[in-house]
Amino acid sequence: MDQQLTDPTTCLAWLEGHARARRAAGLRRSVRPRPAVDNEIRLDLAGNDYLGLAQHPDVIEAGVAALRVWDAGSTGSRLVSGSTALHAELEAELAAHTGFASGLVFATGYAANLGVITSLVAPGDLVVSDEHNHASIVDACRLSRAEVVVVPHLEVAAVEAALTGRAYRRALVVTDSVFSADGDLAPLAELHTVTRRHGGVLLVDEAHALGVVGARGEGAVAAAGLAGEPDVVATVTLSKSLGSQGGMVLGPVAVRDHLIDTARTFIFDTGLAPAAAGAALGALRLLVADPSLAARSRARAQELARVADAPSPAAAVVSVVLGAPERAVAAAAACREHGVAVACFRPPTVPPGTSRLRLSARADLTDEDVALFATALSAALAEPAGVPGMR
């Protein structure tokens, strides 16, 4: 056998070439630990804490109380030792708030999407998926082994065509409600009409809508009048508006029962940590008690969009498209130098040529925060960064 093929020092040598290619394209990423107290950052617009509840004392205390009662970890699968009374309370109360009959907690929002899609469709079935759907949906579609048709963004007619022109046993139409990069809103009522006409199920990822969309922050599905419909299922994350971690599938009781029996990311994963469940439940109760949080988050998002001359957002996500990845990286770094943390989205997260600053509005932002962002962004876009068109 060729010595080159048996030398253990060369089996991963190809990684270096891939890293060089990503660096040349401006697509290298790095992990930067966030300090408990960051003296350089005066304003965080990078995280997804849309309601400002991650640091709320009641939410923190709810997590601490869960630790004291239920220990540090859930210790096993939800079907073994990983379910607590907190999980059951969270499922019942979040389902009630969003208008669904039942809910099932998963360890992450990613796992919720993987679990529900791979449990609802299989070979012989059809999945119709928006081209801008989250990576967890993309991966779930691949794992399902169903036929997958990716349709142009927000084009209901393309969904209709996909459902009309194929033979299939069952159909699932999948979409984000609020899209994570652009912050735009899917036409849920129209999608539901088309899906129902063809006997399919509509699955909506509400990660960026829960807590922000709707008069009470109940989400886009409920705001569209679709919560509780027998052919509508939703997923949510507990890591954004609820300031914690985890995910949930919401829908008819039959869907919950089916997932308990078949969803591999539920059956074979350790249950959500009690502290995360407790914190999410504490945050949910704050939202229920003060539904104005949703409107305040949306209002601040509109203000940030006006400052940035960005499209009007549907929820809390504000997208400032700059084009080249180098330009977006430089602008994000310049904002940080002025005390403002913003997210930088580059391919493959967004399409080539649309690298951007991605801002997350929060319900607890102040007028002074908005003014600080305006100053930082103006300075960032005025500074040359050695990239054509940076000014």
Question: Model regions: which residues?
Answer:
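PLP-dependent enzyme catalytic core of the Aspartate aminotransferase-like
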Residues: L53, P57, E61, A65, ...
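PLP-dependent aminotransferase class I/II
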Residues: T235-T237, S241-S312
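N-terminal "arm"/small-domain region of PLP-dependent enzymes with the aminotransferase-like
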Residues: D2, D7-A72, G200
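Conserved active-site segment immediately N-terminal to the catalytic lysine
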Residues: G199, E206, L210, E218-L238, ...
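Active-site phosphate-binding strand-loop segment of PLP-dependent enzymes
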Residues: V149-V204
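Conserved N-terminal alpha-helix of the aminotransferase class I/II PLP-enzyme fold
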Residues: E61, V69-T108
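Conserved PLP-anchoring active-site segment centered on the Schiff-base-forming lysine
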Residues: V116-A135
